[in-house]
Structure formats: structure tokens, C-alpha cells
Amino acid sequence: APAPSGGGSAPLAKIYPRGSHWAVGHLM
């Protein structure tokens, strides 16, 4: 999964390591 590079995606990567790309777009 393409993980977006950004400080806001750091905590999301811990919760959704395999879906951090949709998690960031989902919360934002």
C-alpha cells in the first residue's frame, strides 16, 4: 500500500499500517 509521507500520517501508520493511505483520506 502506498503510504503518504507526512507528519500527520505517522500516528495513523501505527493504527493502520496496511491502510494508512485510506485512513489519512478518511479522517481528513
From Swiss-Prot:
UniProt GO cellular component terms: extracellular space; secretory granule lumen
InterPro entries per UniProt: Bombesin (IPR000874)
Keyword entries, A-Z: Amidation, Cytoplasmic vesicle, Secreted
Any single Pfam family the record assigns to this protein: Bombesin
UniProt keyword Secreted, yes or no: yes
Swiss-Prot/TrEMBL GO biological process terms: neuropeptide signaling pathway; positive regulation of peptide hormone secretion; positive regulation of phospholipase C-activating G protein-coupled receptor signaling pathway
Secreted listed as a keyword: yes
Compartments where found: Secreted; Cytoplasmic vesicle, Secretory vesicle lumen
Function recorded in the entry: Stimulates the release of gastrin and other gastrointestinal hormones.
Membership in a protein family: Belongs to the bombesin/neuromedin-B/ranatensin family.
Listed name of the protein: Gastrin-releasing peptide
Originating organism: Alligator mississippiensis (American alligator)
Gene (name only): GRP
